[in-house]
């Protein structure tokens, strides 16, 4: 095999080794997908007092270097994380996820403090201890739950549960007369720091509820809870009911306003359409009117043509200028029929008037 072919084989081997189970490689810039795994997710994590431990075998704690390098499958690194876990939220889950992923082979053990210890050292809780135990049990990152965990970890407790490391955020936790309850754990080299999730905590959730207390009280009253169950006084109960009615009226008014705005908008759009249509029709009407009655309209041409025909029909045709003119003979004198007698002789004045009238009639006929 020559050098070129061997280089190709080696490059294929490197790409195959670098590829993920689904075929994606880092060179391609495609993040590899995580394979689906349902092992250990069908049942909640067991309690520590329900697990049988063989104390006859000696337990040797692993070092940080050995834990980071990886341990055999039968010897996982036992990491302990404790807390109150009241109103279990995503911040708790993320902290336990970090504890689970501290080392390649990790067995997380989570301790939950009882109500008595919590009420004495920290304050009242929303959920009781059984509810908090159950919430932690159903977290996918937990392999074992310790009930009634101690507030301060003792060497006896660490040896009893064979704990290798303790996981918690690095912020000093002052309580029980100590500036930091994890100080001796840090000095022993058993502390594995995790990161706190910002923006979410049990105190933040309680603060939100207290801040909007009236809203949640009214909400639960609507859902059937009594004022006694909510620890609400008679006056506040009536106040909440009145506020609810006022809010309903406001909502109706707002709906009416929105509908009226929509109606006005539709009317405006319709009016704009009508105005545009009216303008188009008016232009058509004006154009048709001008075509009929304008200065050069059809009606004027019709009137001119009709006038010309009427004048042609009324006036006689003129004779040609070259033809000789015919003189008419004077019209005979008018006489009454059946009159055999001649009229008496007229006076000279009457004769002259008769001649003048006769001349006028003859001139009119010539014209």
From Swiss-Prot:
Region (Disordered): 1-35, 313-367
Sequence repeat windows: 319-324, 329-333, 343-348
Residues annotated with N-acetylmethionine modification: 1
Record-listed Phosphothreonine modification sites: 325, 342, 358
Record's keyword annotation contains Cell inner membrane: no
Domain of life, per lineage: Eukaryota
Residues bound to CTP: 84-85, 92, 122, 168-169, 173, 195-197, 200
Region (Autoinhibitory (AI)), start-end ranges: 272-293
Residues recorded as bearing N6-acetyllysine in the entry: 8
Alphabetical keyword list: Acetylation, Cytoplasm, Endoplasmic reticulum, Lipid biosynthesis, Lipid metabolism, Membrane, Nucleotidyltransferase, Nucleus, Phospholipid biosynthesis, Phospholipid metabolism, Phosphoprotein, Repeat, Transferase, Ubl conjugation
Membrane topology annotation: Peripheral membrane protein
Modified residues (Phosphoserine): 233, 315, 319, 321-323, 329, 331, 333, 343, 345-347, 350, 352, 362
Compositionally biased tracts (Low complexity): 330-351
Family: Belongs to the cytidylyltransferase family.
Assembly: Homodimer.
Entry protein name: Choline-phosphate cytidylyltransferase A
Organism: Cricetulus griseus
Phylogenetic placement of the source organism: Eukaryota, Metazoa, Chordata, Craniata, Vertebrata
Gene that encodes it: PCYT1A
């Amino acid at each position: 095999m020559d050098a070129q072919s061997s280089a190709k084989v080696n490059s294929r081997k490197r790409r195959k080794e670098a590829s993920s189970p689904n075929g994606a490689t880092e060179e391609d810039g495609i993040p590899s997908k995580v394979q689906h795994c349902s092992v250990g997710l069908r049942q909640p994590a067991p309690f520590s007092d329900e697990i049988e431990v063989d104390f006859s075998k000696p337990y040797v704690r692993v070092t940080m270097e050995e834990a980071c390098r990886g341990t055999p499958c039968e010897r996982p690194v036992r990491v302990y994380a404790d807390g109150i876990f009241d109103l279990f939220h995503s911040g708790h889950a993320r902290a336990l996820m970090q504890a689970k992923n501290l080392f390649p082979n990790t067995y997380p053990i989570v301790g939950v403090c009882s109500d008595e210890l919590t009420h004495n050292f920290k304050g009242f809780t929303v959920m009781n201890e059984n509810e908090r135990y159950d919430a932690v049990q159903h977290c996918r990152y937990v392999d074992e739950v310790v009930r009634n965990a101690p507030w301060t970890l003792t060497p006896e407790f660490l040896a009893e549960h064979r704990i290798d490391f303790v996981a918690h955020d690095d912020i000093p936790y002052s309580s029980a007369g100590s500036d930091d309850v994890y100080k001796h754990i840090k000095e022993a080299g058993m502390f594995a720091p995790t990161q706190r999730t910002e923006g979410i905590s049990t105190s933040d959730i309680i603060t939100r509820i207290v801040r909007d207390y009236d809203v949640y009280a009214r909400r639960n009253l609507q859902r059937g809870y009594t004022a006694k169950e909510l620890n609400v006084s008679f006056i506040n109960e009536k106040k909440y009911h009145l506020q609810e009615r006022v809010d309903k009226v406001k909502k109706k008014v707002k709906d009416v306003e929105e509908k009226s705005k929509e109606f006005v908008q539709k009317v405006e759009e319709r009016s704009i359409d009508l105005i545009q249509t009216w303008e188009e029709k008016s232009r058509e009407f004006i154009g048709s009117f001008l075509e009929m009655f304008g200065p050069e309209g059809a009606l004027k041409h019709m009137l001119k043509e009709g006038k010309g025909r009427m004048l042609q029909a009324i006036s006689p045709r003129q004779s040609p200028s070259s033809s000789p003119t015919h003189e008419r003979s004077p019209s005979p004198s008018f006489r009454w029929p059946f009159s055999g007698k001649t009229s008496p002789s007229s006076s000279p004045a009457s004769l002259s008037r008769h001649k003048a009238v006769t001349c006028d009639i003859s001139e009119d006929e010539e014209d």
